[in-house]
Amino acid sequence: MRKLTSFACGTGAGLAAYYLQRLRDPQTAVQNSWTHSDKPVDPWALWDTNWDCREPRALVRPLRNSQPEEENRYNAELEKAKAKKARHIILVRHGEYLDVGDSDDTHHLTERGRKQAEFTGKRLCELGIKWDKVVASTMMRAQETSDIILKQIDFEKEKVVNCAFLREGAPIPPQPPVGHWKPEASQFLRDGSRIEAGFRRYFHRAYPDQEKESYTLIVGHGNVIRYFVCRALQFPAEGWLRININHASITWLTISPSGNVSIKYLGDSGFMPAELLTNRIPRDVKNVV
């Protein structure tokens, strides 16, 4: 009996010391599952509400005092700075092409690439979208893809914006590194700055005077689109190469008035026949253009 009493007392003292230590140092407590915690596992998971530098509070002069007149001024300016409608950005990768010759002028779409672009144009037409802006990379394969799509959707070719910021390139060194693709550091510096400038030009919440939801179509390239997706969703940009998207596929991102960003489609190409699904430059056919 004496042994049982001693054991019980020792166990109780140990448990008491354990819980006392937990109260003193709550940071050492571990949840049964990390998903039960309301705090991000990684600080980088916290959403930056002013990612586009258009958060209303960042645009309005701060309160100078607590007087009613000053508070009314601040609230009125804050309301005027708020976006009211969403922006939809639909990104389309160019169709299949052949990397033939030393000049971009010779990098035409293959016959299959033209068919891919035609299916994508029909799909965009079926969605019934009224386009506010169409932007295309200035590279040959993106220009040809854009021309084919324009035949299917209601948008005048003369209004298309041709943007060199969207040209293909090396946005940022990928993680994990890959052995088959290692651009020089100078290329990352040159291309990365340009592609980031393209992101900042087209990805931002709506202006306060925008009265309806807007739709922007961007015809570009695989590397650029994947980088844009990571940046827009505030994922580590170095992870862009882990994503794979097919030729002429559709990626749809929405920027809400609050600045939150969501993705509706990522590399959608299910509207094409299986024989048209490709994502790499063909090596076994001749350029038919």
Curated annotation (Swiss-Prot):
* Keywords for the protein's UniProt record, in alphabetical order: Hydrolase, Membrane, Mitochondrion, Mitochondrion outer membrane, Transmembrane, Transmembrane helix
User: Which EC number applies?
Assistant: 3.1.3.16
* Source organism, top-level taxon: Eukaryota
Catalytic activity line of the entry: O-phospho-L-seryl-[protein] + H2O = L-seryl-[protein] + phosphate; O-phospho-L-threonyl-[protein] + H2O = L-threonyl-[protein] + phosphate
Concerning Gene3D superfamilies, the annotation shows: Phosphoglycerate mutase-like
Q: Which GO terms describe its biological process?
A: positive regulation of mitochondrial fission; positive regulation of mitochondrial fusion; protein dephosphorylation; response to anesthetic; response to heat
UniProt keyword tRNA-binding, yes or no: no
Query: Got a GO cellular component term for this one?
Result: mitochondrial outer membrane
Query: What SMART domains does the database record attribute to this sequence?
Result: PGAM (SM00855)
GO MF term (any one): protein serine/threonine kinase activator activity
What are the TM regions of this chain, as residue ranges?
A: 7-23
Compartments reported by the entry:
Mitochondrion outer membrane
Its record classes its membrane topology as:
Single-pass membrane protein
Q: Which PANTHER family match?
A: PHOSPHOGLYCERATE MUTASE-RELATED, SERINE_THREONINE-PROTEIN PHOSPHATASE PGAM5, MITOCHONDRIAL
Q: What does this protein do?
A: Displays phosphatase activity for serine/threonine residues, and dephosphorylates and activates Pk92B kinase. Has apparently no phosphoglycerate mutase activity.
Q: Which family does it belong to?
A: Belongs to the phosphoglycerate mutase family. BPG-dependent PGAM subfamily.
Per UniProt, subunit arrangement is:
Interacts with Pk92B/ASK1.
The protein's name: Serine/threonine-protein phosphatase Pgam5, mitochondrial
- The species this protein belongs to is Drosophila sechellia
